[in-house]
């Protein structure tokens, strides 16, 4: 059996860590790919490095891209406040970073083709995407078509698969799977704020804490990290 390789976009959060571990459990070699894009929550990069070491990934690469130079998001522009009043339906919050996932996946495709990887693992999740346009099934489908058209391996019929195993999972299921896979959840980072401790108020903290409470793991909620 030929050993296959997955490029896992590793943010330092629970979703990307779980996707990477599912790939490893399936027998794939996993290379982690993280990005320093000028985000205020730089602590996620340390979480990604810690996870890569803890999970014994084949390799872990961090790319620097300064998306903060033109702003457009409260994650890259500290003059904008992070929303803390809960998720607003039917709106895209200012934590959306213009083009972020599109850029990340493009770099992932380049790395995958160069390293001979057969797929890219994405931790995107449509159930709690907070309105982000680049975490939806139609986005993934369209990007897969582009990936097939824009790469040599795609033209040769051996395209790199954009694989999002958690796309339609509830957050509770993701945490249950993370526990089964023995992922050190306490080492993951979800908070949007650039503070030493999770704020417990941003959308990401709220989604995380709600799911953990529902599965009876309040010990892993933001106030306990």
From Swiss-Prot:
EC numbers: 6.3.4.20
Q: Where does Zn(2+) bind?
A: 191, 199, 202, 205
Note the superkingdom of the native organism: Bacteria
Question: A biological process (GO) annotation for this entry?
Answer: queuosine biosynthetic process
Q: How is the cofactor bound?
A: Binds 1 zinc ion per subunit.
Residues annotated as binding ATP are 10-20
Q: Which reaction does it catalyse?
A: 7-carboxy-7-deazaguanine + NH4(+) + ATP = 7-cyano-7-deazaguanine + ADP + phosphate + H2O + H(+)
GO terms for molecular function, please? ATP binding; ligase activity, forming carbon-nitrogen bonds; zinc ion binding
Cofactors required: Zn(2+)
- Please name the pathway: Purine metabolism; 7-cyano-7-deazaguanine biosynthesis
The protein's UniProt keywords, in alphabetical order, are:
ATP-binding, Ligase, Metal-binding, Nucleotide-binding, Queuosine biosynthesis, Zinc
Protein's job: Catalyzes the ATP-dependent conversion of 7-carboxy-7-deazaguanine (CDG) to 7-cyano-7-deazaguanine (preQ(0)).
Q: Which family does it belong to?
A: Belongs to the QueC family.
Family annotation (PANTHER family): 7-CYANO-7-DEAZAGUANINE SYNTHASE
The identity of this protein, by name, is: 7-cyano-7-deazaguanine synthase
Q: Which organism is it from?
A: Prochlorococcus marinus (strain NATL1A)
């Amino acid at each position: 059996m030929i050993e296959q390789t997955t490029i896992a976009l590793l943010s330092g959060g629970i979703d990307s860590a779980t996707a990477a571990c599912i790939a490893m459990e399936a027998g794939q070699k996993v290379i982690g790919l993280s990005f320093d894009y000028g985000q205020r929550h730089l602590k996620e990069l340390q979480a990604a490095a810690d996870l890569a070491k803890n999970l014994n990934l084949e390799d872990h690469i961090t790319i620097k891209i300064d998306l903060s130079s033109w702003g457009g998001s409260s994650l890259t522009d500290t003059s904008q406040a992070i929303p803390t009043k809960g998720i607003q339906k039917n709106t895209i919050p200012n934590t959306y970073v213009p083009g972020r996932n599109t850029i990340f996946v493009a770099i992932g495709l380049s790395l995958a083709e160069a390293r001979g990887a057969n797929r890219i693992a994405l931790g995107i999740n449509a159930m709690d995407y907070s309105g982000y346009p680049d975490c939806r099934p139609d986005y993934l489908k369209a990007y897969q078509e582009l990936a097939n058209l824009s790469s040599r391996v795609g033209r040769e019929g051996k395209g790199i698969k954009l694989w999002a195993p958690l796309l339609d999972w509830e957050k509770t299921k993701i945490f249950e799977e993370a526990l089964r896979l023995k992922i050190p959840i306490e080492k993951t980072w979800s908070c949007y704020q650039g503070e030493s401790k999770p704020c417990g108020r941003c959308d990401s903290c709220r989604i995380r804490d709600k799911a953990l409470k529902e599965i009876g793991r309040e010990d892993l909620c933001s106030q306990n990290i």
